[in-house]
């Protein structure tokens, strides 16, 4: 039923070519995000809030500790597993290219846009984030602000935000 409903939406907008080309990368584009502050109201946005260009509270609350964040929002394994492979097959499907020994390779590109997982890069310097239990401050349960699931939220956070208290820019 969900697939049928999604197909109806795609048909309604004129097929795949009618979908916005920036849908996957919208949150990566600071200019588009900053335009929201100035009254931009793109049709792709169905839920929004306003944020000033220099406001980094969301990043401070949700970045991993190594990026000077509090790591408050931790996606679950169930959410990560809901992202299909790059061809759209569920990771449990026999046709899937999912590989348990390399679980983040060949996945729907939204996974890397929405979730910080072990080995993903994040932050203004594209720091590699290690979330394993024997990893540094970003590892599972290593600090009070460390992930409790092995993942950190990435969607809606600006990777250009610098939360380092000694940052002067």
Task: For every predicted segment, state its role.
Residues 129-168:
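Active-site beta-strand/loop architecture of penicillin-binding DD-peptidases
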Residues 1-135:
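An aromatic- and glycine-enriched ligand-binding surface/loop that stacks and positions planar moieties
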């Amino acid at each position: 039923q969900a697939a049928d409903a999604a197909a109806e939406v795609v048909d309604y907008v004129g097929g795949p070519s009618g979908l916005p080309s920036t849908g996957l990368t919208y949150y990566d584009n600071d200019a588009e995000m900053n335009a929201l502050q100035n009254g931009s109201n793109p049709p792709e946005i169905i839920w929004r809030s306003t944020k000033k260009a220099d406001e980094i509270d969301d990043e401070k609350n949700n970045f991993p500790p190594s990026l000077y964040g509090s790591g408050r929002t931790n996606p679950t394994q169930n959410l990560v597993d809901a992202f299909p492979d790059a061809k759209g097959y569920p990771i449990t499907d026999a046709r899937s290219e999912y590989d348990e020994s390399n679980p983040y390779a060949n996945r729907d590109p939204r996974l890397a846009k929405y979730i910080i997982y072990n080995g993903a890069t994040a932050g203004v310097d594209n720091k590699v984030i290690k979330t394993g239990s024997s990893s540094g401050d970003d590892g599972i349960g290593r600090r009070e602000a460390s992930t409790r699931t092995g993942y950190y939220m990435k969607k809606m956070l600006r990777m250009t935000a610098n939360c380092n208290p000694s940052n002067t820019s």
